[in-house]
């Protein structure tokens, strides 16, 4: 089962439904817009999924709308009209969504936030560093710097994940360990554990990290970093802490927050009693490790969601 299909099932049950909302396909960008049932102008939250691609965050959009936000899932690869792989994705994809959302009469364009998970968290931090109209960021198990794009099959050429103004963003490349891990996993030698590959790349290519860091000092609002210490995709704790250190070093004048969840895995935030997953099938005989335990992931999710909504309420809903 593809990770995107599993996320479809888990996202739909993540947050309790509080009121009827209306959801419709976006017309000026690829995604879904969900609106609260109440009238008036509302704060906005843009939602970016991870390396599963597609429009999977549409399932969370309705839940954020139930909490009083105009919520828009923004797809950025893997659907018609978009790049088919997570490679050199234009940050202007988010800019187009911002323009479309900002023109709506039911939103307060001065209260716009962005949420991203994993690669979407990486993308959200780049977007918020680029567009001053974003005033709050929730970065779930993110990277505060650009990583190499996810390879296409056996391709070995390194590309950036993102572009700004048509130019590739400086990035941290993978090391040889990453290719070895894929070869071992798909050669029948155990599950795919990406964490050692990212750890090796951070060590071997440490000199590239400063140049690949996003200009988080340009973010016009607070950032919530969420990390999981049993993350088997990448070290979201170390990466989030690099982001926090960068903000402090650059005197970011907002109430930034760092939440670290012990024992939790990469997609803990979307854990439910039915889908508190610690690994996922990625082929007929291969699984990919996500980390955590069912119990730890469920406990962390139950703590994290109220914190996310409280953070966004303080940053956006209360002006």
Give the label of every model feature segment.
Residues 18-43:
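N-terminal cap/lid segment of alpha/beta-hydrolase-fold proteins
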Residues 106-118:
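Alpha/beta-hydrolase fold nucleophile elbow
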Residues 85-105, 126:
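Alpha/beta-hydrolase active-site loop
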Residues 129, 136-218, 272:
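Accessory cap/linker subdomain of secreted extracellular hydrolases
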């Amino acid at each position: 089962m593809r990770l995107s299909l599993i996320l479809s099932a888990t996202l739909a049950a993540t947050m309790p439904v509080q009121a009827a909302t209306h959801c419709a396909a976006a017309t000026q960008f690829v995604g879904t817009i969900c609106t609260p049932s109440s009238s008036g102008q509302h704060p906005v939250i843009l939602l970016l999924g991870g390396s599963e691609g597609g429009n999977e965050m549409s399932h969370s959009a309705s839940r954020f709308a139930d909490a009083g936000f105009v919520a828009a899932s923004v797809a950025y690869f893997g659907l018609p009209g978009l790049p088919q792989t997570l490679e050199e994705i234009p940050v202007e994809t988010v800019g187009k969504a911002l323009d479309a959302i900002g023109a709506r009469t039911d939103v307060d364009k001065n209260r716009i936030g962005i949420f991203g998970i994993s690669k979407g968290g990486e993308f959200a931090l780049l977007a918020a560093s680029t567009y001053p109209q974003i005033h709050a960021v929730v970065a779930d198990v993110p990277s505060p710097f650009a990583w190499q794009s996810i390879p296409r099959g056996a391709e070995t050429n390194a590309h950036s994940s993102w572009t700004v103004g048509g130019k590739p963003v400086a990035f941290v490349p993978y090391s040889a360990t990453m290719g070895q891990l894929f070869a071992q996993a798909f050669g029948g030698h155990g599950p795919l554990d990406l964490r050692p590959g990212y750890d090796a790349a951070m060590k071997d290519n440490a000199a590239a990290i400063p140049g690949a860091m996003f200009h988080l000092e340009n973010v016009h609002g607070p950032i919530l970093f969420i990390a999981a210490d049993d993350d088997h995709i990448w070290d979201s704790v170390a990466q989030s802490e690099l982001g926090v250190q960068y903000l402090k070093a650059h005197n970011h004048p907002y109430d930034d927050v760092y939440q670290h969840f012990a024992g939790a895995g990469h997609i803990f935030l979307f854990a439910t009693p039915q889908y508190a997953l610690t690994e996922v099938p990625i082929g007929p005989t291969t699984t990919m490790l996500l980390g955590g335990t069912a119990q730890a992931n469920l406990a962390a999710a139950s703590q994290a969601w109220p914190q996310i909504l409280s953070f966004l309420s303080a940053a956006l809903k209360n002006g």
